[in-house]
Amino acid sequence: MEKKNIGNLLVLYPKPMTVVGAEVGGKVNWLVVGHTGIIGHDRILVSMSKSHYTNQGIRKSKKLSINLVSRDMLPKADYVGSVSGASVDKSGVFDFHWGENGTP
């Protein structure tokens, strides 16, 4: 399939699989989110259920990382999307470093 130029649009299409990272209880936790989108040039939208364990860390720190999943990351992303950080330590699943703003 050939690439098609859709112009200068604020869209993520096709929708990529997205992993959100956040610090929860002193450890990194990873979550696969159901929806991400671009609201403007300076902000994005992330949609997830209020009940997710990762929300505790996001609400406390007001920080998260957005990670678009590559083909090589798929098995790990599938894993972090199928178990809860409330019962499983997912901090070692992905290699990461702390960003300047304190996000994994």
Regions found by a protein language model. Give the residues of each.
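Active-site-proximal mixed secondary-structure blocks
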Residues: 1-32, 37-104
